[in-house]
């Protein structure tokens, strides 16, 4: 059995209880493909069906938001790499209650991703092996990836490297194939192209800009996970360099994997194709190109994407709750690590909740699981909002301390304020839209409850912390 090591017993170094086990290629591939999830391959069909070709606008706006948020997060992470990422920065710059709240909300978001991705993987596997129940597949996939996360961070990195590589190959192959078809390189396949689609199916904005707004709210959540690289980089040998590289590359990553590939889909599949939502945008595009075994190909790619997301969900949730425990904002047992510097209690606790919610999905009333999902529905926007507010305050702290700012947010503070206003507007719009209102209410209830717990925890367990000027202060 591995010897358990308390974080406090390790040398006094940044993240000393976690080892820099991620190699450069691990972090690089994670940063490249971390943004590619099952939502791109399947969920994009809903956005296209709702907004038509103007779904490109929705993805462009959402992608721009993510680029700006990642720039702000990159500024803070380069200045102070930390496994807790934005939760730690909120703790230091806004207040302990803020770090507590957003850390636990983020953890909750990812432990709910575990059953979602496990169920999606199980559905694909059950279609291939119908004799085995889906809940068995769901638990088996979760168990397998939990085991890989228990050994070492390098195991997580290696699995994620190959998952990411396969996703990148699949997207690039699709883009190349689609581009060849659009320019007439596949003479036996008729592809109308974007201009013809715009003329034949109601124009670029066939359902009005209200539909684009609805699609925007959907697409914004597709990018959740881009920020994981700032958490993972803290377990690499040169976190500041890795974060800088990942943040600088986010523009072309979103442009290539989302905008270009969605453009290809729209150029091949009419937005009002009745099968677009039913089978997914990428499968429908391959079917229209008469690619043999289109469903099998897409199912394999989606299975890889789902496994990748599940793997990252286990890793990310465990690291966030580990960071909370180190700061005294979670049970102290969750900051224990073994000799491989893996926070096994944090991994097991996060996965246990994931297992529980998977069981709830199969055996509890449907309304229970629906409410659980709704409670995390607006967490992505809250995370982005906290990152923006923390960056506003942390920049002032860094300047006051005299610490050089090696990586800067553009047009500070104007772009930061623009992001804050945009997020507040998006939350307000969600509140008045019937299809999103329940998500805002459920997330708001959970947030208020967590804030109260955070304030109570700070009062009951005061701790000493260091601000960026190096002074000791009561928080």
Swiss-Prot record:
Disulfide bonds: none annotated. GO terms for cellular component: membrane. The chain crosses the membrane at residues 27-47, 48-68, 105-125, 127-147, 163-183, 211-231, 250-270, 296-316, 345-365, 368-388, 413-433, 438-458. It is a multi-pass membrane protein. It holds the Pfam family AA_permease. It is found in: Membrane. One of its GO terms (biological process) is beta-alanine biosynthetic process. Keywords: Amino-acid transport, Membrane, Transmembrane, Transmembrane helix, Transport. Belongs to the amino acid-polyamine-organocation (APC) superfamily. Amino acid transporter (AAT) (TC 2.A.3.1) family. This is Probable GABA permease. Induction: Activated by BauR. Disruption phenotype: Cells lacking this gene grow normally on putrescine, cadaverine, and GABA, but growth on beta-alanine is completely abolished. PANTHER family: GABA PERMEASE (PTHR43495), GAMMA-AMINOBUTYRIC ACID PERMEASE (PTHR43495:SF5). Gene3D superfamilies: Amino acid/polyamine transporter I. GO terms for molecular function: gamma-aminobutyric acid transmembrane transporter activity. Involved in the degradation of beta-alanine.
């Amino acid at each position: 059995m591995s010897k358990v090591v308390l974080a406090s017993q390790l040398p006094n170094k940044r993240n000393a209880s976690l080892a820099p086990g991620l190699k450069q290629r691990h972090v690089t591939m994670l940063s490249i493909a971390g943004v590619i999830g099952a939502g791109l391959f399947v969920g994009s069909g809903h956005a296209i069906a709702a907004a038509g070709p103007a779904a490109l606008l929705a993805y462009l706006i959402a992608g721009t938001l993510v680029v700006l948020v990642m720039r702000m997060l990159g500024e803070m992470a380069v200045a102070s790499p930390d496994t807790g990422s934005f939760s730690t920065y909120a703790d230091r710059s806004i207040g302990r209650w803020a770090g507590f709240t957003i850390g636990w909300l983020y953890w909750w978001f990812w432990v709910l991703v575990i059953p979602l991705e496990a169920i999606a993987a199980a559905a694909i596997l059950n279609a291939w092996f119908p004799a085995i129940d889906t809940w068995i597949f769901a638990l088996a996939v979760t168990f397998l990836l939990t085991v890989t996360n228990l050994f070492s961070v390098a195991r997580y990195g290696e699995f994620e490297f190959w998952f990411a590589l396969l996703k990148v190959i699949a997207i690039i192959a699709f883009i190349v194939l689609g581009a060849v078809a659009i320019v007439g390189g596949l003479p036996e396949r008729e592809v109308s192209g974007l201009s013809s689609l715009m003329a034949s199916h109601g124009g670029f904005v066939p359902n009005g800009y209200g539909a684009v707004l609805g699609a925007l709210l959907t697409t914004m959540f597709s990018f959740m996970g881009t920020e994981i690289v700032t958490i993972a980089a803290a377990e690499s040998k040169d976190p500041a360099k890795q974060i800088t590289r990942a943040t600088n590359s986010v523009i072309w990553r979103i442009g290539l994997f989302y905008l270009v590939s969605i453009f290809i889909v729209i150029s091949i599949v009419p937005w009002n194709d009745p099968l677009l939502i039913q089978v997914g945008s990428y499968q429908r595009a391959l079917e229209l190109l008469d690619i043999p075994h289109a469903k099998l190909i897409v199912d394999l790619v989606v299975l890889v994407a789902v496994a990748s997301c599940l793997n990252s969900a286990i890793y990310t949730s465990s690291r966030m709750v580990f960071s909370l425990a180190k700061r005294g904002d979670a049970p102290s047992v969750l900051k224990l690590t073994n000799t491989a510097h893996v926070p096994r209690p944090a991994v097991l606790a996060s996965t246990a909740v994931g297992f529980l919610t998977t069981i709830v999905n199969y055996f509890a009333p449907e309304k229970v699981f629906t409410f659980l999902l709704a409670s995390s529905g607006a967490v992505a926007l809250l995370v982005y909002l906290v990152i923006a507010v923390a960056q506003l305050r942390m920049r002032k702290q860094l300047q006051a301390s005299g610490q050089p700012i090696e990586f800067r947010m553009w047009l500070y503070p104007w772009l930061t304020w623009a992001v804050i206003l945009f997020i507040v507007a998006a939350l307000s719009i969600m509140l008045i839209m019937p299809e999103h209102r329940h998500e805002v209410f459920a997330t708001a209830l959970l947030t208020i409850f967590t804030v109260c717990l955070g304030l109570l925890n700070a009062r009951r367990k005061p701790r000493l912390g260091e601000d960026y000027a190096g002074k000791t202060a009561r928080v």
